[in-house]
Amino acid sequence: VRHMLPGEKAETMYLGAAVSTVNETPPPAQTPAVTPEPTPTPRQPERDAVYLAQCLWGEARGIPSQTEKAAVVWCVLNRVDHPGFPDTIHGVLSAPNQFLGFSERFPVDPELLALAQDVLDRWRAETAGAGDVGRVLPKDYLWFSADGHGHNAFRATFRQSAAWQWTAESPYPT
């Protein structure tokens, strides 16, 4: 029999395997790991809304009316829906000699981005079958040009057709 020194472990031999028996300190109680709540990632604006905001920057940033700015976006979306134009927002905006006020290098103004996203959401709701979504420009208006007085004139044909007279009710402040 061997005398043990303080802190030494006693061992019992059992079929050639060492088994610890006495003077063993139990392991510390483990606290379950706390998983931190994930920090919400800020929602990145979708690419189409960014393109539309850049178009608004170039085509309508000096226009005071939100309704008239929204009409620029509706004009783009009308073309997306029309068989005579590309079927994507970027395709419509980047088509040669069309939206000369669009550039992917233009800044993305937060207010213009919010307006672009709002119109895009309304258009998608309309495409999904919703009724009155707050459309400010009829579907057949595919063209616009500056009137020289800080406004755009929207038309159903490229040349010499009557300009839209703003008879639709607008969901935006004037």
Describe the predicted segments one by one:
Residues 7, 25-28, 66:
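Compositionally biased, intrinsically disordered low-complexity regions
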Residues 42-174:
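Bacterial extracytoplasmic/cell-wall-associated proteins, especially those involved in peptidoglycan
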Residues 19-21, 25-41:
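Ser/Thr-rich, Proline-interspersed low-complexity disordered segments
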Residues 1-9, 39:
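Gram-positive cell-envelope targeting signals
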Residues 7-8, 35, 84:
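Intrinsically disordered, low-complexity segments enriched in polar/charged small residues
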Residues 13, 17-19:
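Long, intrinsically disordered low-complexity tracts enriched in Pro/Ser with mixed acidic/basic residues
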Residues 2-3, 13, 140:
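Intrinsic-disorder/low-complexity peptide segments enriched for small residues
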